[in-house]
Amino acid sequence: GVSNFTPAQFALLQSRLPFTLATNQVEISPVHQPLLLDGTLDQLQQLRIRPMAWSCLGGGRLFNDDYFQPLRDELAVVAEELNAGSIEQVVYAWVLRLPSQPLPIIGSGKIERVRAAVEAETLKMTRQQWFRIRKAALGYDVP
């Protein structure tokens, strides 16, 4: 696999290899959403390749940056609606809800963090909840 390749870079490398690339490891989180619009996830979905998602929690920005307080508030509301154990679980559920079916990379060896990510698989996030989180992270309505 590769890491942080644009669709053009991925296609170029793939065209020169005698084997199929396994994945593209990319940053995906509510606080980092460009890949939802730049074709990266679309390309991987078209090729039936599951991306690996790094920094799902935004490298701590989600919890430490005042700019993301509205996002934290919305994540807390959705956590209550889903009966989730934490907003962290809701973030992982948000990533898992993407049609490209990303595989989150858990950047921690702490068992409680790994458990939160695994338990996110059981959350049944609605499309409306997903878009509310997207809107709260962006700070404006999603067209």
Residue ranges of predicted features:
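Beta/alpha (TIM)-barrel catalytic core signal, keyed to glycine-rich beta->alpha loops juxtaposed to Asp/Glu
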Residues: 1-143
